[in-house]
Amino acid sequence: MSKILKEYTYTPAKIDKGYSGKSLYIHVGDLRIEEKEVTEFMKEKFVGGKGFDLWYLWHAVTPETRWDSPENEIVMSAGPLGGITQYSGTGKTLVCAISPLTDIPIDSNVGGYYGPLLKFSGWDALELQGKADKDILIFIDGNKGHIIIEEADDLPEDSHLLAEELTSRYAENEQDKVNVSVVSTGSAAKHVLMGMLNFSFYDPRRKTVRFKQAARGGLGTIFRDKHIKALVVKYKGIKGDTNNPADLATLNRVGIKYHKQMHDLDDKQNAMRKIGTANTIMVMDKYDLLPTRNFQTGGDPDAYKISPQVFINEYLTQGIHDGCWYGCTMSCAKTADHFPLKTGPYAGQCVTVDGPEYECAAGLGANLGIFDPQAVLEQNFYCDT
């Protein structure tokens, strides 16, 4: 067992109209854990999500703060609609910090279970400040109202291994794994300024941990600089009204309309449920907007080799729900299952590749002059983990 450095107990707040009314502050350097009130002013002026992130970041930093300054914060928040199950896109977490790439505030929008589970555990936002002396893990049990900070020296470094281990560690059984979400970054974040964060969710159909990424601005680099190995949250008992919205009847009515529109129109317009955001590859190529060979051109005659249809026909599992939160009929979090790696430290293994998103297909494919879907997916996996 890892050495426990700090424990903290709290009474989980009941969600009222999308808010718990509390935020969680953790200083990973001196191990302080504090509760802060979410005021009516904050809700009125900043709403939640990125608004709350920027509010807390504004009060944490100075004009002299750099990305690797101890006072720089990583702030995470799900807005007042976070975690509702009536329509798509509500599993989002908004993450902000001073970026190592720009030296100004950056925000990144990520799917998965962490934001909703954090909110239902009683927290509208999470602030992480300071720097730990050694790698640590932070675990929040939202049902028991218990927070643990412990040493993390014995854990794998790469996210696909780390999240699998932590999901199994904190889940009581196979059925309980859907109640656990892990935030982590991989070994690359120690060496580059563009490191990103993986937000996990457990896929009970595939029986594997999957990821969405907060990939903008180098958030994973800050995470590793603070010596945070992983954040883990656990909450079970999700229901359709856990968010306790102000007007559930209207929410249900709007949700039904929303689901019908996606069902009727998606195949005609975007094919998000078949390919996700990579549906735009050939559209961008057609309009001379596909970044190719380091933006020398806006398209290429070989672009068809990484077209959406190639990924749909040859790589991405079809006919299975791919939402990254309950009730998301957009179902755009596509996956290449049992994908055989040919290179790198995991060569010969079959892995789950989350993607490709458009940014991966364009950035790791066309923009590098690579029009090989196998190579794009392989790079996708290694960039993620």
Spans of features found by a protein language model:
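Intrinsically disordered, low-complexity segments enriched in small residues
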Residues: 1-109, 113-385
